[in-house]
From Swiss-Prot:
Family: Belongs to the NAD(P)-dependent epimerase/dehydratase family. Dihydroflavonol-4-reductase subfamily.
EC number of this enzyme: 1.1.1.219, 1.1.1.234
Species assigned in the record: Hordeum vulgare (Barley)
Protein name as catalogued: Dihydroflavonol 4-reductase
One MF term in the entry's GO annotations: flavanone 4-reductase activity
InterPro entries recorded: Epimerase_deHydtase, NAD(P)-bd_dom_sf, NAD(P)_dehydrat-like
GO aspect biological process, one term: anthocyanin-containing compound biosynthetic process
Binding site for NADP(+): 44, 163
Pfam families with a match to the protein in the record: Epimerase (PF01370)
PANTHER family attached to this UniProt entry: NAD DEPENDENT EPIMERASE/DEHYDRATASE, STEROL-4-ALPHA-CARBOXYLATE 3-DEHYDROGENASE, DECARBOXYLATING
SUPFAM superfamilies per record: NAD(P)-binding Rossmann-fold domains (SSF51735)
Keywords: Flavonoid biosynthesis, NADP, Oxidoreductase
Length: 354
């Protein structure tokens, strides 16, 4: 890339990843057009408008993935698009029409807007680890060449299945459109994103990441064999790939692998005020982690800066500051019950959300 500092578009700009990315881009000197579904929602836009540099280089634009063409105006004249927005409704009663269809059609609407603009040099799409490793027989390691088994996801309908399917199908559709229309398209594939955040509510990624603290057993299966990346590292990688002249294709963005046992020990050591469970029904004490390889990203010269401890320290302190989790004395959930599902191999990486 030629170092042009914008303007660039960030979709889903009020979300967990989107808002942090807007902050990082402003810090780097970019002019940013932030798209949100409802610019009148002060709770969503206030954290963005208060960022350093926002007064001079940030504008808020209305756009919705479910409305074809709604991104055209924001994208017109831009040099780059960071597509982060995605529907995330794990409780949807009609996932095909409420999650999968708007994700894929919204992706293609954005691709068409980029083609029409004629100024967009690169599109960076935030995909998910769920587009890579969801299959009947998990492997010990994955890289950017692996794809989830869509038929398996639709048949088994594990937690978050519609999110995994939507990301994989949107990514494939965008890659095909980019190839046919001469667009420069890159997808970055984060694993479970953990760290500090700007938004007011609890990000879905942290509902999962902090499940051992909150006692949310339904999310333990995801932590069984989990891969992690710090939010700040992810956003740095997104900007890095946007600017790197040789970047192309898919990139895993994952700095650490862990098991639920290792996370439980680490959290108990660092936060003894919480009663963290240490035993999990049906989970082998010698369980080995599953590795997600970021070699392709690292080979370009990128480096991760944060440890697993950094991720959780920042996430927990931010949640405490916002009153989203108690300061301590959380009763530990009993072993068994939903934990038995861990033995069935349901643990999968979810990745990022807006």
């Amino acid at each position: 890339m030629d170092g042009n500092k914008g303007p660039v578009v960030v979709t889903g700009a009020s979300g967990f990843v989107g808002s942090w990315l807007v902050m990082k881009l402003l810090q780097a000197g970019y002019t940013v057009r932030a798209t949100v579904r409802d610019p009148a929602n002060v709770e969503k836009t206030k954290p963005l408008l208060e960022l350093p540099g926002a007064k001079e280089r940030l504008s808020i634009w209305k756009a919705d993935l479910s409305e074809d063409g709604s991104f055209n105006e924001a994208i017109a004249g831009c040099t780059g698009v960071f597509h982060v927005a995605t529907p995330m409704d794990f409780d949807s009663q009609d996932p095909e029409n409420e999650v999968i269809k708007p994700t894929v059609e919204g992706m293609l609407s954005i691709m068409r807007a980029c083609k029409e603009a004629g100024t967009v040099k690169r599109i960076v799409f935030t995909s998910s680890a769920g587009s890579v490793n969801i299959e009947e027989r998990p492997r010990p390691a994955y890289d950017q060449d692996n794809w989830s088994d869509i038929d398996y996801c639709r048949r088994v309908k594990m937690t978050g299945w519609m999110y995994f399917v939507s990301k994989a199908l949107a990514e494939k559709a965008a890659m095909e459109y980019a190839s046919e229309n001469g667009l420069d398209f890159i997808s970055i594939i984060p694993t479970l994103v953990v760290g500090p955040f700007l938004s007011a509510g609890m990000p879905p990624s942290l509902v999962t990441a902090l499940a051992l603290i909150t006692g949310n057993e339904a999310h333990y299966s995801i932590l069984k064999q989990v891969q992690l990346v710090h939010l700040d590292d992810l956003c740095d990688a997104m900007t890095f790939l946007f600017e790197h002249p040789e970047a192309n294709g898919r990139y895993i963005c994952s700095s650490h692998d862990a098991t639920i046992h290792g996370l439980a020990r680490m959290l108990q050591d660092r936060f003894p005020e919480y009663d963290i469970p240490q035993k999990f029904a049906g989970v082998d004490d010698n369980l080995q982690p599953i590795h997600f390889s970021s070699k392709k990203l690292l080979d370009h010269g990128f480096s991760f800066r944060y440890t697993t401890e950094d991720m959780f320290d920042a996430a927990i302190h931010t949640c405490r500051d916002k009153g989203l989790i108690p300061l301590g004395d959380v009763p530990a959930p009993a072993a068994g019950g939903k934990l038995g599902a861990l033995a069935a191999g349901e643990g999968q990486a979810i990745g990022a959300e807006t």
